[in-house]
Amino acid sequence: MSKREDGRLDHELRPVIITRGFTENPAGSVLIEFGHTKVLCTASVTEGVPRWRKATGLGWLTAEYAMLPSATHSRSDRESVRGRLSGRTQEISRLIGRSLRACIDLAALGENTIAIDCDVLQADGGTRTAAITGAYVALADAVTYLSAAGKLSDPRPLSCAIAAVSVGVVDGRIRVDLPYEEDSRAEVDMNVVATDTGTLVEIQGTGEGATFARSTLDKLLDMALGACDTLFAAQRDALALPYPGVLPQGPPPPKAFGT
């Protein structure tokens, strides 16, 4: 089987590195690396929920995505300087939020909000899929933080793990985890978000340079789900380590009557 320019086989992911506790202030902070793509994912806990969510007893999870000006080869202006977010930035922010809300019981949070921030430090393709995969680990740490603080009505609000990967057809071959060099010339480009229980959260697929058959779609999904299994294993290995910071002390249990 022929190898790709970076030496990988078609079904192989780039090296994946997940570093927890990358910064100190958020409840969850993760640097995730998919090869040369590097994304800082944080999960911050704030009291209260958006106005439209108040008095429901339900929590909320929101997400924001951004790229540093020097994340790509040529510097780009910050979107805050331009005065508006691009359609791409808004789309990816919503995708990350939707993906993570699929795995958490918001009722268990009470009226608290988890804010996910994904900042691309270096981009070489697959930034949104790396962001989702890393943000899940940051979210899991934020849940651990909330549990220690005694703010969860359910100690296990996460129903599954979430990971995402890109897959596409390049040079007539189905390949997974496309770097920029492949993504920029792919005939078919797809992003797949999945759970570790075998279900799908979202599929974004486009025939960039050609139409594609249903049989090709099935092969793309099979390769993507196989790659997600590898990502789930990397997430589990990362989360098997102790919480990388100082956990809060929850409120003491109520005293029994008469004591």
Curated annotation (Swiss-Prot):
Q: Which UniProt keywords apply?
A: Nucleotidyltransferase, RNA-binding, rRNA processing, Transferase, tRNA processing, tRNA-binding
- Sites binding phosphate sit at R88, G126, T127, R128
Cross-referenced PROSITE patterns = RIBONUCLEASE_PH
The record's function comment reads: Phosphorolytic 3'-5' exoribonuclease that plays an important role in tRNA 3'-end maturation. Removes nucleotide residues following the 3'-CCA terminus of tRNAs; can also add nucleotides to the ends of RNA molecules by using nucleoside diphosphates as substrates, but this may not be physiologically important. Probably plays a role in initiation of 16S rRNA degradation (leading to ribosome degradation) during starvation.
Which GO terms fall under biological process for this protein? rRNA catabolic process; rRNA processing; tRNA processing
Quote the gene name from the UniProt entry. Answer: rph
Protein name as catalogued: Ribonuclease PH
What this protein catalyses is:
tRNA(n+1) + phosphate = tRNA(n) + a ribonucleoside 5'-diphosphate
* A GO term from the CC aspect: plasma membrane
Q: Please tell me which top-level EC class this enzyme sits in.
A: transferase
Q: Which domain of life is it from?
A: Bacteria
Question: Which species does the entry assign this protein to?
Answer: Mycobacterium tuberculosis (strain ATCC 25618 / H37Rv)
NCBIfam families, per this entry?
RNasePH
Could you describe the subunit structure of this protein? Homohexameric ring arranged as a trimer of dimers.
Family indicated by similarity? Belongs to the RNase PH family.
Q: Which GO terms describe its molecular function?
A: 3'-5'-RNA exonuclease activity; RNA binding; tRNA binding; tRNA nucleotidyltransferase activity
Write the Enzyme Commission number(s) for this entry.
Answer: 2.7.7.56
